[in-house]
Amino acid sequence: KFDTVDIQKYIQYKMLQSEIKFSNARAVGNKNVIPLPHQIEAVYGRMLQVPRVRFLLADDPGAGKTIMAGMLMKELMARYQSERILILVPPLVLRQWQEELEEKFGLHFHIINRNTLREYGRKNPFIENDLVLASMYWAIRDDVKPLIQEADYDLIIVDEAHKMAAYTQGTNKKKVFRTKLYQLGEAILRKAEHVLLLTATPHKGDTENFRHLMKLIDEDVFTSSVVNE
């Protein structure tokens, strides 16, 4: 008689055995993480198949986006493609992200906040630490945003990425209103080698709003308003 864990392990084994594209997998061997088939396919079958990982990961709440983000981080680090990582999340889930990444992947992320700034004095904590977690709303402050811009990151992950919103206004579709979060995205995401945006609500019925979000991933492809969905 098999339980759920046995079935998941068997599916994982068969996928890894039958697909050569999964042959270099590192994160799935972690005893603390038993990824589901859709998580394996997303990370190994899609994201890691391109030299620059720049993806919008849209999935239902509870589908394990944090797990997929952790798997991606472990793989990129194991392949020496990412050393410095920044994760921006809503403030209420900062500790949850930190604890889950520590427990499941052995990754210790430093939470940077106003107390951290005081502790570091004249030093920039975003430069001094390689693995950083910060509140996305705190990051847009005028005294914080420049500190993030000074630090170069190999991989930037944004949870609730749809909050980095921009809107085309007017009938001529030439005036664009950019929220402060979107302006932060423009400032830091385009210079990062790898970007992963996480959201459960990527498209809210506004095609232009969605196009602006995708521009943060690939400005060349999504610059023109004639790009169709």
Say what each PLM segment does:
Residues 54-58, 86, 196:
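Short hydrophobic/aromatic beta-strand immediately N-terminal to the Walker A/P-loop
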Residues 2-7, 11-47, 63-190, 221-229:
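SF2 helicase/translocase NTPase motor core
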